[in-house]
Amino acid sequence: MYPNRHRRASFCSQPRTYPRNSLIRQQSLFKRNVSKRRPFQTVKMVDDSMMKAQRIHENQYGPDFSLAHNTAVSTFISYPDIAKSLPNRTRSYIKLKRLRFKGIVKVERVHVEVNMDCSVPKTEGVFSLVIVVDRKPHLGPSGGLPTFDELFGARIHSHGNLAIVPSLKDRFYIRHVLKRVISVEKDTMMVDIEGVVALSSRRFNCWAGFKDLDIESRKGVYDNINKNALLVYYCWMSDTVSKASTFVSFDLDYIG
């Protein structure tokens, strides 16, 4: 790349001379090239300045997030709409920076089983919260999101290290896994959950894109996302007849 750098010696005893006219031509040519590039740089700076750092908040709770034992639920993180009120977005794309979540899981024993010695068995199980990036979002033939079993093979795999099935690795990848092993003798128990997921870094930027086919469809729902949707999977595995109810708040930091 630098052929003269590693030579032992390379000297020239006579000073180099350049015609005066050639220097003038080189200087004027350089100035013209610089002036041509300035308008492009100015336009790019103005375009980027219209996008600003924002945060969108979302709570996920209710009957749809109450899991019976050995079941799983799939959902998605809502993105901002094109709107005048904040938080919003001004383009058909946003830069995803960071996702924070915090909440509780309430584990309840549904039917109390009493043993011969009048003791109540423990409620033991594994609760998992998995955040997955969907590179090419689209609804399946059933009209719903991919299920836990379709993505990871089986719910029982939540006891070990989760992995995307080979046939779907080109479309999905796991971004974060939170797992809690729960053992409780009481009828109910509250478990705190919390985590931070970095989506972009100095070396890598994660951009989400939207279809925005018309004015009414410029929403942040899964059906309007065409690049890098964030999916959330909740799973509760237990041999005891029980249920796990979740209340989780998500804060998505983005530039849009």
Swiss-Prot record:
Superkingdom: Viruses
Main location: host cell
One term of GO molecular function: single-stranded DNA binding
Coiled coil: none
Membrane topology: Peripheral membrane protein
Motif Bipartite nuclear localization signal: positions: 21-42
Pfam families: Gemini_coat
Compartment(s) where it occurs, according to its Swiss-Prot or TrEMBL record: Host nucleus; Host cytoplasm; Host cell membrane
One CC-aspect GO term: host cell nucleus
Subunit structure: Binds to single-stranded and double-stranded viral DNA. Interacts with the host nuclear shuttle interacting (NSI) protein. This interaction may allow NSP to recruit NSI monomers to the viral genome and thus regulate nuclear export of viral genome by NSP.
Protein name as it appears in the record: Nuclear shuttle protein
UniProt lineage: Viruses, Monodnaviria, Shotokuvirae, Cressdnaviricota, Repensiviricetes
